């Protein structure tokens, strides 16, 4: 309750409004953008649901499939011209519309089954007839006819489907229905007109309702055999799967989704749309993508956090995830929905994953109001009520502003929450976006980690040339993205560079040493492992989940995830992306990719003993400090890296890098690399011969 006097009540209202106006500016930007984004997503979801129902209605007409589609497009275009919908009727969103229809179908089935226990006895029926909920009681009476004959057992053994209902209604006399609904006639009902057909005996047949359109059977389950989990990324998980028809193994990326998060401006399809347009030897190959409902038996993905359409959960095997509030600068320990920067640190242990929550661990508005209330009202002499004004804030007089509505929404009563919790969510069954790509199990990160177990410090010139050529191939792929496709990757790092097996004659292939996984391998004075072989690989850029077009205007529209937050890997993030003022301007600038490539190039050329050494060296590198042995042995490479890590307007482009002295003649450079590899092989053979001669001297009886 509020205060015991009208004077106190008015003061309570004024006090609450003053607190709202005082608190909201400090948190207003984050909540305002979050509120506007949720509102836009809700409106778009409503439009998708409307179009899904319209499409289902057209499919139930007595027309041919072609005529039904034409009828659907005619009505959809009319609604679009009226401003009611946008492009929710487009062909690419058809799987989403089918999922909406199927989810509504499942919800109706659950609602139908929830009424069955109400019709267990005749006495309970009579009491319900006299209750205020007369309509519900009569509905339960009608449904009790269906429950006879073991129907409840059938419900437990079959999937929720309107087909079960239609099978019970096929031979149900119309009089039985009319006795339950005397005030209406089925002939005049719009729903009955939609689904009613009568056979020769006058019985009702729900053949159209029986053919309610649902999402097709799982293409993934029928066409692919899942082999193993390859890894987890920001949006979903990647699995190795074999196609049952061609026998080829592919990489299948699964991105769990929620229906309510879909919108026509959604970026959730950005990766598949981008991959479908790309065609370059140094870019991962794309085959197909589709959306389908997750089967109820597939528990593994359902237990994972579901990605919304415009948010990314960087939940891969990375232990250090930082989040900074853009308005307050406070470090958050969870994943709130307010304005934030989310950076993904490098993995330390594959079995460590962060825990997510929707609540902030910083300032709590309720506690803040309560402290101020105790302080202010302790000096008050006019109020006779001792009831906490904070506890009753949600029951104040209605307000008009959106900021007050946001605050009021956080004070819902427990009773309202309990009542709502008993009703199932419309989109409880999650969707999944599948992206089928070429399989590349080896990544540059894995190769570098193996190499660093064998080589420490500065490498020989021959090996350096190998990695310089490898970096040139990566630059060619980045040049294609920037200049030909006008895209910014935004997450270039060794983990997102895949190494596909190739041959010497294949374009864009590079010969690299094949280091073993053993930790204790003998290393010579020339920093060359005694036992190693060469392999040919083609570097391919992958993981386009954060890609943006250079032409995107990030300053327009509050629904852009790029505007509200930046998601990436902090080790490779350009410094301007840490500034909230520069982020909206530089987030889709190609210079941010060049900065990440500068860090990557340094890692390629300079092996580290430990992770701590790597972190310290990269931190110094960002300050312009190079290791002394790196500067002495590679001055030209150091100069190039320094230019790539300079201010954004001074960084070279990918084209300028490829025309630099270090990469000016790739053909000649490639010949030097192969010549260096040959010299290294001859050197290793001579070392082996020397070791054999020593063994013969030490053991004359040794036969080799």
Curated annotation (Swiss-Prot):
Signal peptide: none
Keywords of the record: ATP-binding, Kinase, Nucleotide-binding, Phosphoprotein, Protein synthesis inhibitor, Serine/threonine-protein kinase, Stress response, Transferase
Record-level Gene Ontology MF annotations: ATP binding; eukaryotic translation initiation factor 2alpha kinase activity; protein serine kinase activity
Domain Protein kinase stretches: 224-667
Binding-site list for ATP: 230-238, 253
Pfam families noted in UniProt: HRI2_3H, Pkinase
Substrates-to-products reaction catalysed: L-seryl-[protein] + ATP = O-phospho-L-seryl-[protein] + ADP + H(+); L-threonyl-[protein] + ATP = O-phospho-L-threonyl-[protein] + ADP + H(+)
Coiled coil regions in record: none
Catalytic residue positions: 491
UniProt modification remark: Autophosphorylated.
Domain of life: Eukaryota
GO cellular component, one term: nucleus
The EC number(s) this enzyme carries: 2.7.11.1
Alphabetical list of PROSITE patterns matching this protein: PROTEIN_KINASE_ATP (PS00107), PROTEIN_KINASE_DOM (PS50011), PROTEIN_KINASE_ST (PS00108)
Induction info: By heat shock and arsenic.
One annotated GO biological process: negative regulation of cytoplasmic translational initiation in response to stress
CDD domains in UniProt: STKc_EIF2AK (cd13996)
Reported function: Mediates down-regulation of protein synthesis in response to stress conditions by the phosphorylation of the alpha subunit of eIF-2 (tif211) on 'Ser-52'. Protein synthesis is inhibited at the level of initiation. Activity is inhibited in the presence of heme.
Family note: Belongs to the protein kinase superfamily. Ser/Thr protein kinase family. GCN2 subfamily.
Name this protein carries in UniProt: Eukaryotic translation initiation factor 2-alpha kinase 1
